[in-house]
Amino acid sequence: MQLTELIETTVTGLGYELVDLERTGRGMVCVYIDQPAGITIDDCEKVTRQLQHVLTVENIDYERLEVSSPGLDRPLKKLADFTRFAGSEAVITLKKPLDGRKTYRGILHAPNGETIGLEFERKKGEAAMLDFTLADIDKARLIPHVDFRSRKQ
């Protein structure tokens, strides 16, 4: 079984989503997990323990295993990610330029079939819609919005 498939099966079996997986040349395996309610340190510990066991049983060589949440600026990789985060602000970098640019920032629209929409500002106050597919994307990330103001009024 391939490493990605092995880790995804383990992570989803525990009730989490595998967001991303990175393997460095120095033997480090980084696993990014998520779930609708968010990820806690306990979730990371639970997945780490299970993956350590599975990787040992499957005789997968690694130096260090790191499990964490994808962060507020999580990557968007699957069509389901774009469905889940429709209405959120994101930055999309295309593989090939469209109308002279590759990077767009705007509000995600739910996919229609394989086509994903991003509403962006073309010029001051002029809204436009970018339609693209997963195959067109080089990188896509959410843009986090953090409010540091006190909730006290």
From Swiss-Prot:
Q: GO CC annotations?
A: cytosol
Main location as per UniProt: cytoplasm
One BP term from GO: ribosomal small subunit assembly
User: What keywords does the record list, in alphabetical order?
Assistant: Cytoplasm, Ribosome biogenesis
Cross-referenced InterPro entries, in alphabetical order? Answer: Ribosome_maturation_RimP, RimP_C, RimP_C_sf, RimP_N, RimP_N_sf
Q: Where in the cell is it found?
A: Cytoplasm
Q: Explain the purpose of this protein.
A: Required for maturation of 30S ribosomal subunits.
NCBIfam families membership: PRK00092.2-1 (NF000929)
Q: Which family does it belong to?
A: Belongs to the RimP family.
Protein name (Swiss-Prot/TrEMBL): Ribosome maturation factor RimP
Organism lineage reads as: Bacteria, Pseudomonadati, Pseudomonadota, Betaproteobacteria, Burkholderiales
